[in-house]
């Protein structure tokens, strides 16, 4: 029995050490927490993380890495930093979870988990979200289906005009929003104080 456990420990150690990998992406920082979901159907959890630099376009706004070897599955550009943590739900019924991630400049994106193609963008390129009083989207959370489309919907906060000086007391309000996960449309929106 002692040899069984010794051999088991040895083979588990070899298997676990073979699963280590690292990946390097040039010229971005991240405040996004890495999240995992199987995006390529191989049974191994893959890693999704947002990135970028405040107020700058990034070619590496959101990246998905293969959980087996750390190779890049796909990446998407972003008009500003994506600092939210991804959540996952199969929105296009292909059997693979899709990615919802958020960040500055009212970026809230739904991305096909398998291909990396954009499913919807709350504020597409070429629009100025601040003109509508919307600023940063923070970490999204799923809630029960509100709009009756059989998909869990998104509860998310929006606010924080970080370009305003810290001493400015007359700030635009924040919003607590319910967003359709299927198409990115606003279902409900409530004004909340912003500090």
Per-region residue spans from a language model:
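Beta-strand-rich domains and repeat architectures in extracellular enzymes and scaffolds
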Residues: 23-58
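Beta-propeller blade termini
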Residues: 32-41, 50, 84-91, 138-146, ...
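Hydrophobic beta-strand segments that make up the repeating blades of beta-propeller
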Residues: 47-51, 99-102, 154-158
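Short glycine/acidic-enriched loop and turn motifs that connect beta-strands
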Residues: 52-57, 105-107, 160-165
């Amino acid at each position: 029995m002692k040899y069984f456990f010794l051999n088991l420990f040895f083979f588990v150690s070899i298997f676990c050490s073979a699963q280590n990998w690292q990946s390097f992406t040039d010229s971005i920082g991240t405040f996004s927490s890495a999240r995992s979901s199987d995006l390529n159907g191989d049974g191994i959890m893959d890693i999704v993380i947002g990135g970028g630099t405040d107020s700058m376009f990034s070619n590496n706004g959101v990246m998905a890495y293969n959980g087996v070897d750390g190779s890049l599955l796909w990446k998407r550009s972003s008009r500003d930093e994506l600092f939210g943590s991804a959540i996952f739900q199969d929105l296009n019924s292909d059997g693979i979870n899709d990615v919802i991630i958020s960040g500055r400049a009212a970026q809230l994106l739904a991305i096909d988990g398998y291909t990396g193609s954009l499913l919807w963008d709350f504020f597409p390129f070429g629009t100025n979200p601040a003109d509508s009083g919307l600023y940063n989207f923070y970490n999204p959370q799923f809630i029960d289906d509100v709009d009756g489309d059989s998909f869990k919907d998104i509860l998310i906060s929006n606010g924080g005009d970080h370009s305003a000086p810290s001493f400015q007391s007359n700030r635009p309000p924040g919003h607590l929003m319910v967003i359709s996960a299927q198409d990115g449309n606003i279902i409900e929106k409530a004004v909340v104080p912003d500090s």
